[in-house]
Structure formats: structure tokens, C-alpha cells
Amino acid sequence: MNVVLFGPPGAGKGTQAKELDKHYQIPHISTGDILRANVRDGTKLGKEAKGYMDKGELVPDEVLIGVIKNRLAESDCKPGYLLDGYPRTTPQADALSSILVEIGMPLEVVLNIDVADEELVTRLCGRYVCTCGESYHMKFNPPKKENVCDACGADLYQRDDDKEDVIRQRLDSYKEKTQPLISYYGEKGLLVDIDGTGAIDRIFSDICKTLDQYK
């Protein structure tokens, strides 16, 4: 199955993607992760991307789509893929569609995890992270010892972009950028809205009911 995953900051997209990766044995492809991997490994596209990133500029669409195309050509993508973080604009969606058809892996469904703004603010304001990669929530998933990571014992910290004023700006920006894509995929009959409020297991079950149609 070939899937694109949308969801605002704090919607639990990463959590669901991790579980879907395990359940369906299709790789979770985060464009940010694969871009950083290409830069780290010094690939041709990675060097090209680094040139823009070092200058604080956005990586051009043609470089991003090249990185995605190369990742989809890897053997673990044969059963399908779960693409996260791309597209972000309708021109990117058009370019992605062309590439996916060209390589014989056309998009089958776009999942949009939908959560109300106030719920997202509550979720994100309580989020604390560790340098080891672990993430906690002071209300929903607190560490055993206050402000200390269960996994490695290091102090937890709150990212600047998890503070309320910044969160609201991020949500406004997300809606402004993503709404045209929601309409774009809705018109193509590919969009499925998922209620992202409530228990993680229930949300996962709802997603699986949708994706099982594409197995």
C-alpha cells in the first residue's frame, strides 16, 4: 500500500507511523530524516542539499523529489511506503504524483489525522524531550522521576517550539499551507480524515480499518 500521512504538530503522527511501519511492514519515510541521511552520507543529492542548508535556504523541490525517488527505489519499499513530511505544497504534490506514476508506485490513500487546536496546544505544551531521543508528556506520559529521562537519566527539557505562543503560530502556519493540499487530495478522492482525538490504540485501529482496504 502506498500512503501519504498528514497531521498537524502534536497530532501523534510519528507515534502512529511507527506502529504502522511495524504492523504492515512498510517503511515510514520521513523526508527530513532521509534528507539528513543523504547529507550525512555525502551522496550527490546530499551535497547539493547541504549547499542550500548551509546558507539557510530551502532545499529546492527538484532535490527533495530526487531524494524521495532514490529512497523509494530501495528494496524495502516494494510492499509500499508511508510518506511523511512531503508534499507541503500543491506543486510538490504534482511533482510527487508524476514521479510515483513513473516508478509504478502511485499513491493510493492520503491519511489526514485531524485534532482540534486546543487539544494540540494541551498536548504540545506538556511535551518534554531528552537528548537521547525519548519524549514524555507531563500530563499523559510523565517520567518516573520528575524532569529526568527514564531511559538514560539525563535532564529533560522543553523545546522552544513547544511553548504556547510558538505552538499557535505553528498551527496557523500548518493550516495555511496544508489546506490547499487537503482540497487537492480530496478532489482526487484520495483523502481519508482520521479522528486523532482519544486513545492511541483506537486511532491506530481506525487507521488500520482504512488501510486494510489497500492490502
Curated annotation (Swiss-Prot):
Provide the Gene Ontology terms for cellular component. cytoplasm
Residues reported to bind Zn(2+): 130, 132, 149, 152
Question: Mind telling me which Gene3D superfamilies this protein's record contains?
Answer: P-loop containing nucleotide triphosphate hydrolases
Q: Look up the EC number in the record and give it.
A: 2.7.4.3
Pfam families per record: ADK (PF00406), ADK_lid (PF05191)
Enzyme's top EC category: transferase
Q: Name one GO biological process term.
A: AMP salvage
Q: Which PROSITE patterns match?
A: ADENYLATE_KINASE
Compartments, record wording:
Cytoplasm
Q: Which reaction is this enzyme known to catalyze?
A: AMP + ATP = 2 ADP
> PANTHER family this protein is in?
NUCLEOTIDE KINASE
Could you give the domain comment from the record?
A: Consists of three domains, a large central CORE domain and two small peripheral domains, NMPbind and LID, which undergo movements during catalysis. The LID domain closes over the site of phosphoryl transfer upon ATP binding. Assembling and dissambling the active center during each catalytic cycle provides an effective means to prevent ATP hydrolysis. Some bacteria have evolved a zinc-coordinating structure that stabilizes the LID domain.
Q: Which family does it belong to?
A: Belongs to the adenylate kinase family.
Q: What name appears for this protein in its UniProt entry?
A: Adenylate kinase
List the gene name.
adk
